[in-house]
Curated annotation (Swiss-Prot):
GO terms for biological process: photosynthesis. It comes from Emiliania huxleyi (Coccolithophore). This is Photosystem II reaction center protein J. InterPro entries: PSII_PsbJ (IPR002682), PSII_PsbJ_sf (IPR037267). Keywords: Chloroplast, Membrane, Photosynthesis, Photosystem II, Plastid, Reaction center, Thylakoid, Transmembrane, Transmembrane helix.
C-alpha cells in the first residue's frame, strides 16, 4: 500500500455497492417485518 492518499476505483465501487445493497436489504426486511413504518 504505497499509494495511501489515492483510493482505487474498484474499492470505492465495492464499498459503495455493499453499502447500497445492505441498506436495500435492511429496508426490504424492515418493511416486510413491519418495522419499516417506524422509519
Amino acid at each position: 500500500m504505497s499509494d495511501v492518499g489515492r483510493v482505487p476505483l474498484w474499492m470505492v465501487a465495492t464499498v459503495g455497492g455493499l453499502a447500497a445493497g445492505g441498506l436495500l436489504i435492511l429496508f426490504v426486511f424492515g418493511s416486510y417485518s413491519g418495522l419499516g413504518s417506524s422509519l
